[in-house]
Structures are given as structure tokens and as C-alpha cells.
Amino acid sequence: MDIDRREFLRLGATATAATAAAGIAPPLLRAVPEMRPEVPGMEIEEATIAELQAAMAAGRLSAVRLTRTYEHRIEALDRNGPSLNSILQVNPDAGSIARGLDRERRAGQVRGPLHGIPVLLKDNIDTADQMMTTAGSLALVGPAPAQDATVAANLRAAGAIILGKTNMSEWANFRSFHSSSGWSGRGGQCRNPYYLDRNPCGSSSGSGIASSANLTAGSVGTETDGSIVCPASICGIVGIKPTVGLTSRAGVVPISHSQDTIGPHARTVADAATLLGGMASKDPDPRDPATNDNRDKVYSDYTQFLDPTGLSGARIGVARKGVTGYSEETDGVLESAIHSIQNAGATVVDPADIPTIDQINQGAEEITVLVYEFKRDLNAYLASRSGVPIATLAEAIAFNLDHKDSELKWFGQEWFEFAESDPYSEADYNTALAEERRIGGPDGIDAALAKDNLDALIAPTGSPAWPTDLVNGDHFTGASSSPAAIAGYPVINVPAGMAFGLPVGISFMGTAFGEPKLIKLASGFEAATKARVKPKFVPSLPLDGSVRRRDRDGDEDRLSSGPSLALRHI
């Protein structure tokens, strides 16, 4: 079964016109509940982690009160009201953990900037507590894992409160050719917080929604190709996709050890940087060989690189070929971003194309690597779980067939079946892995940076949110995540503007372990633009025939039910 990139794009289509039938509430049947003031003299909504810490240091706020405030918002906005459906579980131990952290603070023992800060984790990140880890699938419903994922353990050690687990695209969007971003058999369909009939992207859907809707101070997602940065773009927040190996993947339901990485979602670059420092593995993790090298390039404090004037004197390249031209509206946000970057004192080189982008967009190497690694990596992970219904990919396939009314009611499991069939030899895999590393890294992003002595590349992260449509699938035109994904390089999405009331983000791309430079640039862009707009949970976004998109060749077509091609985000 040969699949080229264009087919890969087409097969990545899914979403939700039939949300009620998916087991979630119908669109906004009553007004959004009024948020009662939980903290006298302080507005929790949009508060930064630094502001929350200052309030706790001054005695105006406690970890217990902050946790209760977010729990109240979850009940009002996620379970009721707009029913965002972004959270699968709230940690029953969150309150007691918060009380313990408040006692530490009163004793003068503050662990750091995350002390007492509630954080949500994507449901594919193991926690050894009273919460399950299921990757959104009923096939993993059962006892909690025996051990925390390393990122969860690191966050706990930093003083963060694991508030709960977020809904996600089931199995991180690597089950079906036709899955809907933000849908899982366990949780149903997530909703975009800006317009509830729009898709939140995925696979870290709930993490993006919850941070945008102020249900948490920040959240943690995972990415193989686009799953942190796409929900960040579409949900109007910051997302950092770190270099592979900066954060440990131990205890995370895998797709690909060559591309998987764990990173933060937050409303500001500063908050995302704070979370990244708490998550990062400064020492090698024996459970993840990718953390063995480059520890001198990993920091416990990434906020030191924040700089509101970070664009001044920088050289920024605009990657256009293969990652722009999908819609007038998205391109308009890009042009505005370029203008802001220039006004902030940067030199812009336009275009600064990735020379290997055509081969990257064909996707043959990436597909080979992901399909080959998925079966092996997933089976190895499942061997660590006990008391759940499945122990292998083959058993997951059989489970879904036995529970097709709940798991296969909207789409199938073609990626599962394809991976289980072992279509690629070890030689095929080794060749593809070496080639994707080359075209993504040295001959791709690195070559583009070196050609014009650039500090970073920018590109639109993706187009605005499409209508959720479980029957026909995701409708997005394209994205810029793949070069960094296959190289294992970092990307930061920052809100850049709005199109039809929907957020559009810009990605800053750099070389391996280039997070310090990207954080400096991203914080400068954020300070120059202040583009984030708080969501208002509007029921639907009606569009008329004036909305148009451009195909790759520049011709224009009228947009009806959505773009004909969709780049999968996994």
C-alpha cells in the first residue's frame, strides 16, 4: 500500500457536523455562566503564572483557592454552558496536593515559579495516581499506570498541581485516515472556544482549548507532526514544540520515537517558557535514550531568554514555498506579521524557502518512519501497562472491532491496520529515517538559515479553524509543521491575528536546541503585536460565498464545505 504526501493529506480528513450524535452537548443551549469572582481584588482570567505567583507570595491567593477557581471554571464552561468537552478527568487529589503546597509556602519552602500552579496534561501522559491514561481510547480504560511519565514527575517536583487530563484526538490522530481532530471514543468531540461549531485541531485538542478558555494556568501536549502547534494556532495560544530529546517521552503513549516530543500550551510566551523549564530533563533519563546527549543545551529556566525587544537586530526569513498560499486570510495575517517584525527592528529576508520542501511535502519518508515505528513503539509501551483490555496493537484493532458502536461509529482504523501489516522492511525504514533527517535538518531548515545568516524562519502555522464535521472529516488546507517534525527541531507558535473571528498563528522555526533564541524572538513578536484575543464561546460562525481560498497553483475556488486537502496533525 503506497501512500504519497498528497494522499496523506487527503486521508487526514475528519470532523463533526453531528456533534450531538457524538455524545456531547448540542451547541450552546443557554448563556455562558457568569464567572463569580473567586479571588477578591484579582481577575484570574488571563492571569499569567508570574501574576499568580506574586498574588500567592503576597498572601492574596492560595494554591487551594486557585485550584478551586479552575475547577469551578471547568464545571461552568467545560461540563456546562458551551460544553467545551476539553477535559476527561479532574484529579480528585488536586485539592489535597494544593493544601500541601500551601503549607510548604507558609514554611518558606517555595520550589520555584510553578509552585502551586495547576496544570493539565494530555491524556496520553502517564500519571501514577487516581487518574487513568487512555490516549482517549476505551481500549486503555483501567488501572492507572504504575509510574509517572517523566514530564509529569518533573512538573510535580517543580511544585505544579496536576489538575486533570485533557481530551484529545484518539491515539494522537494515528488510528484512522479519516479521523476528526479532537474526537475520542472516551470523550467525544472537543469544541473550539471561539466558535463552538469549529474544530480545535489536534491531537492535543483539549490542552489547547483548556489553556485558551482559562480552565488552567497552562497545559501539556504532545507532537509528532503538528499536534502542539496546530491547536495552539487555532485556539489562539502559545505552543512550544521542543527539540526531540529536550523533554523525556518516557511514560507517554507513543507514535514515533524519532519524532515524538512533549511541550507546553499557555496564553503567553512567558508562561510557556516557565512550563518548559519545569518539564525539561536536565539529566539523562534512563527510560528515554533521546535524553542522553546535549544536556548542556537544556535549561531549567527558559524565562531568562524572554525579551520584549527580542526582534531588534534579528534576521528573520519568510518560508513561503510549500507552506503559504492556502488562503487569502491566512496570507493576510502573515503579511501583517512581517510588517510588525520589521517595525520591531528585525531584518526580514523574503522569501527564505526551505530548499527540500517539495520532497518534505511528498511525505514518503515520514510515512515510512511513522508506520514502522508505531507498531514497535506502541507494543513496547503497552507492555508496561497492566489491567487494561489490550497489550498489543493487534489487540487494539480487535478491541475496536468488538466495540465498533463506540469506537468505530464515525471512522475506521486504517492507520492501525496498515501499521500492523508491517508494510516496510527494516532496510526501507533505515533509508527513510536517514533521508527525512537530511531533508528536514541539514539540507532543509539548517540550509535555509545558513543561506542568509538567519536567526529563525517564520511561516503561518496553518489556516483558521474549519467546521467540525464527523461525517466528512477535517477540512484544513495545509500547515508548516512537517520540516521541523521530521528534523526533530523546535517550533514556537505565537498568536498573530484573526480571520473571521478565528485565531491564526505564526510559527518560529530554528535549529536543534534553538529554544533560547526562538523564545527571545517569540516574546519580542508577542510584545510587538499583542495579538491574542480571549475566546467568547460563540455558538456558530456562518460564512457566505465571499470566503475564498487559493489552491497551490494560485487559482481561486469558492469555499463550500471546506478545503479539499487536509494535512494530518499527529
Please tell me what each predicted stretch does.
Residues D452, P464-S482:
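Short, surface-exposed loop/helix-turn segments at secondary-structure junctions
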Residues V32-D225, T243, R267-A270, G441, ...:
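Gly/Ser-rich catalytic/binding loops embedded in alpha/beta enzyme cores
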Residues A76, I161, S212-R320, T324, ...:
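Structural helix-boundary/capping segments
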Residues T67-R68, A149, D301, E328-D353, ...:
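Acyltransferase
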Residues T134-S137, R191, S203, V253-T261, ...:
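Flexible glycine/proline-enriched surface loops and loop-helix/loop-strand junctions
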Residues G116-A135, Q304-A319, T368-D443, P495-P503:
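Short helix-loop capping/hinge segments that flank enzyme active sites or metal/cofactor-binding pockets
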Residues M1-I97, R106, R320, S336-A346, ...:
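An N-terminal boundary/leader segment
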